[in-house]
Design a protein with these regions (language model features):
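Glycine/serine-rich anion-binding loops at beta->alpha junctions
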Residues: 53-89
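Extended polybasic, low-complexity segments that bind anionic RNA or targeting/receptor surfaces
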Residues: 1-45, 90-205
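Short coil/turn segments at secondary-structure boundaries
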Residues: 47-53
Length: 205
């Protein structure tokens, strides 16, 4: 069974943790692709809307009589053929979300973490606690760990961390329940506290 170093804030190895093969096996790239597409589809607002001829203001009166004028027959000034007319087949509000099976979602997250580990971009630290919810404290932590783009993962009770990183560019903090494949892949490094990493392993095993 492979092992991963647990580092402290100075970057020194403090302990090691086992990496179960059930989680860190070969990555399934197609499943990762499907999970990312699903995540992004579920994030869409789906509020784009255009007005068809039924909803454009005006156009209730027939512009001229049907026959006898020599002009083309027209029933409404809001025909899509006319200037200021309605839109044909334009977008309408809709729900883009769809369900991906829970097994597939978990397997995709396992694959994403396996790829991060293979690229040496998976980090486990002894703890991510901050004394105060201050941006400068979070920035000091990021600097000490020599990170640039990072996803920090800890338990929900670490409220100071979540508040402190809000103003840091390229850094995001989530709790274990909020961990998703898109955030894992969108950041160069994924940093777990030891307790969060153990919780994720238990969830994915």
């Amino acid at each position: 069974m492979a092992k991963l170093d647990i580092i402290d804030r100075s970057g020194k190895t403090a302990a090691q943790v086992d990496l179960p093969e059930s989680v860190f096996s070969a990555a399934n790239d197609h499943l990762i692709y499907e999970a990312v597409i699903n995540y992004r589809a579920n994030q869409r607002q789906g509020t784009a809307a255009t007005k068809t001829r039924a909803f454009v203001s005006g156009g209730g009166k027939k512009p001229w009589r049907q026959k006898g004028t020599g002009r083309a027959r027209v029933g409404s000034t809001r025909s899509p053929l006319w200037r200021k007319g309605g839109t044909v087949f334009g977008p309408q509000p809709r729900d883009y979300s769809y369900e991906l099976p829970k097994k597939a979602r978990r397997s995709a997250l396992r694959s994403a973490l396996a790829k991060k580990h293979a690229a040496q971009e998976l980090i486990v630290t002894s703890e991510l606690e901050l004394k105060e919810p201050k941006t400068r404290e979070a920035a000091a932590l990021i600097k000490a760990l020599k990170l640039d783009s990072a996803l920090l993962v800890d338990l929900a009770e670490n409220a100071n961390l979540f508040r402190a990183v809000r103003n840091l560019p390229r850094v995001k903090a989530v709790d274990v329940a909020g961990l998703n494949i898109y955030d894992v892949l969108a950041h160069k490094s994924v940093v777990f506290s030891r307790r969060a990493f153990e919780a994720v392993l238990e969830k994915l095993s």
